[in-house]
């Protein structure tokens, strides 16, 4: 009888410990997620091909960003299917980063020393530590709450902490409306003093102006062709 009680007590303790572990795991990510089969996880990781970076890659326009409670900053960049996330300290000095492959958009969150990468097209949430080890790969559920979190948290252009307000933005004047990414990351203290942490404004200007140039050329060719055909039909 005594052994039976000990076994029951041990089972209860294990259940409490496991429940606590599950609660902590769920608290690490704000999205509600579901587990994946190991074979599917391996396929995802093979396709993404995530690699740790020890040297800072060339800076590109900002797709997304996140700020940790200690002021550590994660900046997500990329073009086409090659993406990077670079980790900077509070002064904007590069620490380490990751490169990976994905054709769609992505968002990031930095919680303590764990980086969460959220893939929009596949609804995958990936957690990776500073050593480049994958902690988890789960699927983000399609819920109203998750959709709201995508829009208002993951892809927010402003993050506020106790000491600073971090903002990603452009400095292109009236041409800001043509930019789908961001060229500046700034932090502003409680006294209104602004510090630029990340700046690729010249790159963004070239991208936007080049796009506008090709749009104008395309429209001009279209208008000229239409005018030529109308004139020809009247002859």
Predicted regions and their residues:
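Eukaryotic scaffold repeat domains enriched in small/polar residues
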Residues: 4-13, 18-235
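Acidic, glycine/polar-enriched metal-coordinating patches/loops
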Residues: 1
């Amino acid at each position: 009888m005594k052994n039976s009680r000990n076994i029951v007590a041990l089972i209860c303790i294990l259940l409490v410990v496991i429940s606590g572990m599950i609660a902590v795991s769920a608290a690490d990510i704000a999205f509600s997620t579901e587990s994946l089969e190991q074979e599917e996880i391996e396929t995802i990781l093979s396709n993404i091909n995530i690699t740790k970076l020890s040297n800072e890659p060339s800076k590109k326009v900002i797709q997304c960003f996140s700020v940790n409670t200690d002021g550590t900053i994660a900046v997500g960049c990329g073009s086409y299917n090659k993406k990077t996330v670079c980790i900077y300290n509070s002064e904007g000095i590069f620490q380490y980063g990751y490169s990976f492959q994905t054709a769609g958009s992505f968002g990031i969150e930095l919680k303590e020393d764990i980086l969460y990468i959220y893939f929009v097209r596949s609804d995958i949430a990936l957690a990776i530590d500073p050593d480049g080890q994958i902690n988890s790969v789960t699927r983000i559920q399609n819920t109203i709450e998750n959709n709201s979190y995508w829009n208002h948290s993951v892809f927010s252009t402003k993050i506020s902490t106790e000491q600073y307000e971090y903002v990603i933005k452009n400095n292109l004047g009236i041409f800001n409306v043509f930019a789908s990414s961001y060229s500046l990351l700034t932090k502003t203290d409680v006294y209104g003093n602004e510090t630029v942490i990340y700046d690729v404004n010249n790159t963004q200007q070239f991208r936007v102006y080049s796009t506008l140039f090709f749009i104008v050329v395309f429209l001009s060719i279209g208008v000229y062709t239409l005018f030529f055909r109308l004139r020809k039909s009247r002859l």
